[in-house]
Amino acid sequence: MNPNDLPRDVTLESPDGLLAAVRAVARGPLADVVEAIDRQGYYPRAELQQLGALGAMSAHLDAPAGRSDFGLAIRAMAEVSQVCGATGFMMWCQAVCGLYMQASGNPALNGEALMAHASGATLGGTAMSNPMKSYAQIE
């Protein structure tokens, strides 16, 4: 999804514009590869990177990486999950990893590294969700 392909009255600056762009990726390029994801183990790197470039996987992060809008991040994941649950889960993994990076206080994980992750230029996840939830006493 190229942001220039959006209708002129829809911009990525508005939550509705972002969700419209996410929906277009989900129902277009992602829908085209769902069978390959489910049956052949295709990793939707290009589709995830499109979603990241739109801001769909960083909406929950604080500025300058995101909008500090957890609700918008969840709605974006829901739009994708309606088409492909596996890709929706990968969005969650990317989002949580970004949140951990931002909250780490580690300069090496913020700045350029966080911005690359937030934009989808780099993809990642966390293998330590359960220990981190326990440590933060949210489980």
Question: Locations of the language-model features?
Answer:
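Generic structural "secondary-structure junction" signal
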Residues: 39, 92-93, 130
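Short, solvent-exposed polar/charged micro-motifs at secondary-structure junctions
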Residues: 46, 71, 100-101, 135-138
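Internal helix-loop-helix
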Residues: 53-111, 115, 119
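Glycine-rich, Trp-frequent "lid" loop and neighboring beta-strands that shape
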Residues: 109-139
